[in-house]
Amino acid sequence: MKAQARTVALAIAAGLFICVYRPLASAQKQPTPKELQNIATNAARHFGDAPDDPGPLATDLSYSIKPKAVAKAMRKVADWQLERSQPYFDRIWTWSVLYSGFMAASDSLGDPKYRDAMTAMGQKFDWKLRSHLPNADDQSVGQTYLELYLLKKDPAMIAPTKQELDAILAAPRGSRIPGKEIDWWWCDALFMAPPVWSRMYAATGGRKYLDYLDEEWAKTSDRLYDTTEHLYFRDSTYLTRTEANGKKMFWSRGNGWVMGGIVRTLQYLPKDDPARAKYIEQLKEMASSLAAIQSPDGLWRAGLLDPGDYDMPEISGSALITFALAAGVNGGWLDQKVYRPVIEKAWAGMLHHVYADGRLGSIQQTGAEPQPFKASSSYTYGVGAFLLAGSEIRKMHR
């Protein structure tokens, strides 16, 4: 055992440790019948599943965050997802997050096939958003349309999205439904919509898109951001909800959505935007809070302040957090000396959940709060977050 420990330590030090880790049997609560039905529904819609036998875990990936090693892991996961998913592409948010990951992967890896798949997707849907507007989820696919437009300058790629955003600006704001009086009433919305609006500004120069973005983000932040914990509640119904240990309920994926939304918005926000400093300050506050509660395995549990009640790490939230931290370092908004070790540990932790065929597991199914899930569970949005994280980690070496 001592010799084996020395071998592992030397391999880690060399940045060449190969993923032969196998998770121990978990005592985590199993999904309820209702949650299992949700898993089945997700599988029927082709954006994820949780098989009883997903096969062996990968043994050919390095924990190193050097560009070549990260690229290998990204390709393995991206190729598995693209092959099984492309025939079923849709415009719902569960897919659009994957599309953002594919766009980032093409840029990072220098491989046009993922971007080409996105162009084909846009053509399939005539570059239109889903119809349930102003719902932020249904705006999210516009991020990919706009990124393709900024590369190819084809006005047809953004004309329907621009028409829809302009209609939102012209309509009365908010809803009369209690808790939903603002457009972005749940924290996930801050990943889904704001990057669309900042990209529309980049595409058109229209200041009105940034004005709406800044105004609506401020409303959501005022309602859902806890200025003590520096974390976001999922929505106003969770303001008084607590975990089993009595602490406030903060969902890892929800907070990952917010952090990811901040950096994806900042990347297209002009330097003189009056709210820019507020976004950066909130990113710094959240990064500090999340780094302090990173688990020993490098990841975050579904319930951030009650990790003892969630044995298994949750990959979609962890990947979004890792993406935001790496993007924050690359943007000069976060201190590399402080956050690089956090990022390295998180990336290594995520690789423990890559299977031999490329499946990325330990992703919580769709929902609104921490829930039990299976080790094999893999969903498109978690893969998208993983690819975003890998792309930013590779930039750290440029």
Regions found by a protein language model. Name each.
Residues K76, W80, G101-A104, K124, ...:
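Alpha-helical scaffold segments in carbohydrate-active enzymes
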Residues M1-L10:
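Bacterial N-terminal signal peptides that target proteins for export
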Residues A25-A27:
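Boundary at the C-terminal end of the N-terminal hydrophobic targeting segment
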Residues P112-T119, W127-L239, A244-F250, D357:
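Extended ligand-binding groove/face enriched in aromatic
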Residues M200-D211, T265-A277, N330-D335:
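Inter-helical turn/loop segments and adjacent helix faces that build the functional surface
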